[in-house]
A protein has these predicted regions:
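A short, N-terminal "cap"/entry segment at the start of jelly-roll beta-barrel domains
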Residues: 1-29, 40, 108-124
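Histidine (H) residue identity feature
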Residues: 4, 42-44, 63
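Generic detector of intrinsically disordered, low-complexity, polar/charged segments
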Residues: 17-20, 34, 53, 93-95
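Extracellular/periplasmic catalytic domains that process cell-envelope and extracellular macromolecules
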Residues: 20-23, 43-45, 51-53, 68-71
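Core residues of folded domains in eukaryotic genome-function proteins
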Residues: 26-29, 47-49, 59-61, 72
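Structural signal for hydrophobic/aromatic residues that build the beta-strand cores
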Residues: 31-33, 53-56, 65, 76
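Glycine- and acidic-residue-biased ligand/ion/polar-headgroup-sensing regions
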Residues: 34-38, 44-60
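Double-stranded beta-helix
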Residues: 62-124
Length: 124
């Protein structure tokens, strides 16, 4: 499936989307990355994750995935040991949630201008 630059799409299969999973304690997510696409840093507070890269490769650190290809798509499947793994997208949770700027300045050892730029970019 060709995708435009920086495209990232998640198709979930959890109890909410697929009723047959009710009581099974599993869920799945299909991840599609267009060239330059990124799955922002996040955690799953109620589950571990097993990620299979189905097409090409991505790079990941403490939980983000990114397609570094300039012209090719990446496709991955993430499987979870929970029917409801949840997801907390860290940029939005940290900079879009109303945490006091002084806390963020001290936590990230940076200045107010930088924090305000991050807050502005992550307000939903």
């Amino acid at each position: 499936m060709p995708m435009h630059e920086s495209f990232f799409k998640v198709t979930k299969a959890s109890e909410s989307e697929f009723k047959a999973l009710k009581g099974q304690s599993v869920s799945l997510a299909l991840l599609q990355f267009g060239p330059g696409g990124i799955n922002p840093a996040h955690i799953h507070p109620r589950s571990a994750e097993l990620l299979f890269i189905l097409k090409r490769q991505t790079k990941g650190l403490v939980h983000f995935q990114m397609n570094e290809e300039e012209e090719k798509d990446v496709v991955a499947v993430a499987a979870f040991g929970s029917a409801n793994p949840g997801v907390v997208v860290l940029p939005t949770s940290l900079f879009g949630s109303g945490i006091d700027s002084e806390v963020l300045i001290k936590s990230f050892k940076t200045d107010n201008v930088t924090i305000q730029k991050l807050i502005s970019a992550n307000m939903g």
